[in-house]
Amino acid sequence: MSEVTVKALAEEVGTPIDRLLQQFSDAGISKKAEDNVSQTEKQSLLSHLQKEHGGESTDGTPTRLTLQRKTHSTLSVAGTGGKSKSVQVEVRKKRTFVKRSALEEEQRAADNAKQEAEETAQREAENVAKRKEDVRLAEEKAKRDEENKAKRNTEDTVKREATDKRKAEEKAKRTVAVKQAKSETELLQLRREEEAKRKAEEDSQRQLEEARKMAETNEKNWSATEQNVTANMEKSDYHVTTSTHARAAEDEQDRKEETTGTRRKKKPAAKKADDRKGRGGRNQRNQRGGRGKQKPQVNAPTSMQQGFDKTATVAKSDVVIGETIVVSELANKMAVKATEVIKAMMKMGAMVTINQVIDQETAALVAEEMGHKVIFRKENELEEALMSDRGETQAVESRAPVVTIMGHVDHGKTSTLDFIRKAHVASGEAGGITQHIGAYHVEIGNGMITFLDTPGHAAFTAMRARGAQATDIVVLVVAADDGVMPQTVEAIQHAKAAGVPLIVAVNKIDKDGANPDNVKNELAQYDIIPEEWGGENIFVHISAKQGTNIDGLLEAILLQSEILELTAVKEGMASGVVIESRIDKGRGPVATVLVQSGTLRKGDIVLCGLEHGRVRAMRDENGKDIESAGPSIPVEILGLSGVPAAGDEATVVRDDRKAREVALYRQGKFRDVKLARQQKSKLENMFSHMEAGEVAECNVVLKADVQGSIEAIADSLMKLSTDEVKVKVVGSGVGGITETDAVLAAASNAIILGFNVRADVPARRMIENENLDLRYYSVIYQLIDEVKAAMGGMLAPEFRQEIIGLAEVRDVFKSPKIGAIAGCMVTEGTIKRNNPIRVLRDNVVIYEGELESLRRFKDDTNEVKNGYECGIGVKNYNDVRVGDQIEVFEIIEIQRTLD
C-alpha cells in the first residue's frame, strides 16, 4: 500500500485531523498534517488504538468491552397544599469489562455453574413455595367466594322476602282502593242508567200521547205515525244503551289497568278517577301515540334497581398531630377543605383563620369531631435519641456541696461570702447590692464548697428561685438586729419548695441591738426549729464584719453535706444548669454553668436550652482559663450560638449537627406554642379590652447586662401597672443599646432603660436626632422609682376647690350699668377679682358664677383682705339680699402619684 499523508488518512477514515494527530502522538509517533504515513506506522497506530479501546486479542475476541445504559423514571414529590408533583429522573451507568486469562475463565465458568445451580435450586424452591402459596390463596379465595355467595344468597332471600311483603301490602292497599272506586263507579253508573231510563220513558210517553192525538185527528195516517214512533223509540233506546255499554267497557278496562301489579305507579283511586274523567263521565286521557302520549310510570323491583349511590361520608383516616399545627395542614391531613375545618371550629366556639397555628389539644378535638382517629406524634424523638447516645457511666464519686446563701437585703450575705473568699466582692456591686448570681468555689481544709450568692431584693425572685433549684444546702442569713423580713420568708418558701436542708446564720451579733433569741422565736413561726429546741435546723451565730464563728458555719455546712452523702458521675459527658448568661462585647454570648455531673472540657459540644455550640473557652470565677471542670464547679463558657435563659439545662452531646437540629426544633416549638397562646389570649381578652376603653401606656425598651436582671426588672415593671396606666415592655435583650433598639423606641414612643449597659455611637446619634429619652441605671431601686414617677405623670390630674375668702352682704345698692351691687364686709381670707364665686343664703348655695366688679370706695381693686369693706357686682345675677354670703374659691390642680 502506498504511503499517504496524515490529512489524506484522516479524510479516508472520516475523523478530524486534530484527533488523528493526537492519536499519533499518544502512540509515540510525531506527525504533522503534511507528513506521509507508512504501513508500519499505520500498524503501530492500529495496535495502540486496539490496546487503548479494548481491541481484539490474538484469537479474534475483544479484550475490553464498554457498556453504557440510561434508565428513566418518575418520582412523585409531595408539595404544598396537599398536591404532588412529578420529577423526571435519569440514571446513567457505564461499565467496562476486561477479558481475563484462561484460568480465570475456567474459575469463572465454575463459579457461574455453581451460581446457576444455586439459582436453579433457589428458583425451584421459590416455585414450590409459590405453588404452595397459590394453592393456599386459591383455597382462601374459594372459601371467601363460598362465604360471599352464602352471604349474597342470604341477603337476596331477605330482600326478596321484604319485596314480596311490600308487594303484598301494596296489592292489598290497591285492592281496597279499587273496590272503593268500583263501588263509587257502579253507583254513579246506576244513577245515570236510571236517569236515562226515566228520560226515555218520558219521551216515549210523550211521543205516544202525540201519536194518539194525531190518530184521533188524522186516523188515516195512524199506521205511518205508529211505525215512525216505534222507529224513534228503538233509535233512542239504541243510543242510550250503546253509550251506557261503552262507558261500562271503558271503566272495566281502567280497572284492569289499575290492577296490573307493581309496574304501575301507585296513585289514590279517587283522584285517578276524577282526573281521568271529563265532562259526561268520559275518559279524557289521550290513548294515541305520538309526542303527547303519557306513558305509565313503572318502578322496577327493588332488587333490580340500578343507579349511582353517592357516598354520604368521606373516607376516615388516621391523623398525625404534633405539638402545634396550621389549620390548612390539618385540613390536608384529613383530606377536606380548610373551610370545613374552620366551620367545625366555629361550631365549637373558636374563630380561626386558614394560616393560624392551633395547639395539639384543639386540633385533636376538631379531628375527632369530624370522625377521624387522632395519633399524637412524638416530637422529641431526635432529642431523646441524642440524649441516649451520651454513653453515661454509672461509677459515682462523692462531690462537693453546692450552697446557696439567701436572705433579706443588707443582712450580710455577700459580706459573709466575702470573708470566706478573702476578697472584697461587695464593693464591686453597685450600691453594695448583689445584682447577679455569684458562683464561687472555695477550698478549705476539709474539702471544697461551692457557693451561690443570690440577690436579696424583691425584684430578683426568679433568680433566687433558680438558685434554690440548683443547690444542695441553703444558708439563710438573718440579721440579729432586724430579724425576719419579707425576703427572709420568701427564701424559706423557696428552700422548702426545693426540698433542701436549711442552715440559719444569725449575722451581726456584734452590734449593740442584736437579739439572736428573737430571731429563733420569729423563725419558729415558719417551722424553722433549732436543734437545741428539738428541731432539724442548725443555727450558727456569726459576724461577717469581724469574722466571728465563720469556721463554725463552714463546719456546719460540711456536716450537713456528709449527712446528705452527695455523689455524682465524675467521668463522662457533662451536664449542668445555667446560672446566669450575658453578652460580652468582643466575646459574644457568655453563660455561667454549674456542672452537676460528668466533666466539662474545652471543645465539647453543648446543647443549652434553645442554643447550642462548641465550648471555645472556659473560665473560672476569677477569670482564669481552665481546660476542664468537674461536678459542683461553676464555670463561664464561650461559644454558644446565643444567650440561653437562666435555669436552662446544659448538656454535652456527641453530634454537632444533631445538636443544631434539636436547638432549631426547640426554637420552632417555642415560637409555635408562643403564637398559639398569644392568639388565644387575644381572643379571650378582646371584649375585656373593648370594655376597659383607652388606657395610658408607658412603653419601655429594656437592655441589661445579664438575663436574670432583665427578668427581675421586667417583672417589677409589670407589677407597677394600674387600671389607668399600663407598663409595656416593647423590647428587651442582653447587651449594649444598639441602633435597632433606638429605632424600636422611636417607633413605639418608648423610653430606653439601660441597666449596667451603655449605648453605642450609632444608637446615641439616633437618640439625639429623634430626641428620645435614654436613662442609665446601676441600682434597681432608682430604676423602679423613676419609672413610677414617669407613670405618675401620665395619670389624669386631680382638681380640688379651695375657699380663699368669704364676704357678708351688709347692704344692696342699685347701679344703672351693672345692676345690684352688694356692699360687703370681708370676714375671712381674701376676695380676688378673677376667681369664681358662690352666693350662699342660709348656708345653701343658690348661685355659682364669677365677679363682674370689685371696688373699694370708688376705685377698682384686684383684691380685698379680711376686715375691709368692698362693693361686689355679681355677673348675670341681681337677686342679692342683705345677709347673703359671697364665697370666693379657686381650683387647684393636684398631680396624682401611684402611691
UniProtKB/Swiss-Prot annotation:
PROSITE patterns: G_TR_2, IF2. GTP binds at residues 407-414, 453-457, 507-510. Residues 31-227, 240-310 are annotated as: Disordered. InterPro entries: DNA-bd_dom_put_sf, EF-G-like_DII, EFTu-like_2, IF2_assoc_dom_bac, IF2_II, IF2_N, P-loop_NTPase, Small_GTP-bd. Residues 507-510 are annotated as: G4. One of its GO terms (molecular function) is GTPase activity. Residues 407-414 are annotated as: G1. Residues 543-545 are annotated as: G5. It is found in: Cytoplasm. Keywords: Cytoplasm, GTP-binding, Initiation factor, Nucleotide-binding, Protein biosynthesis. One of its GO terms (cellular component) is cytosol. Residues 453-456 are annotated as: G3. Residues 432-436 are annotated as: G2. It comes from the Bacteria. Residues 101-173, 181-219, 247-261 have a biased composition (Basic and acidic residues). Residues 398-565 form the tr-type G domain. Its main location: cytoplasm. Residues 36-47, 73-87, 296-308 have a biased composition (Polar residues). It holds the Pfam family GTP_EFTU. Belongs to the TRAFAC class translation factor GTPase superfamily. Classic translation factor GTPase family. IF-2 subfamily. HAMAP family: IF_2_B. One of the essential components for the initiation of protein synthesis. Protects formylmethionyl-tRNA from spontaneous hydrolysis and promotes its binding to the 30S ribosomal subunits. Also involved in the hydrolysis of GTP during the formation of the 70S ribosomal complex. This is Translation initiation factor IF-2. The gene is infB.
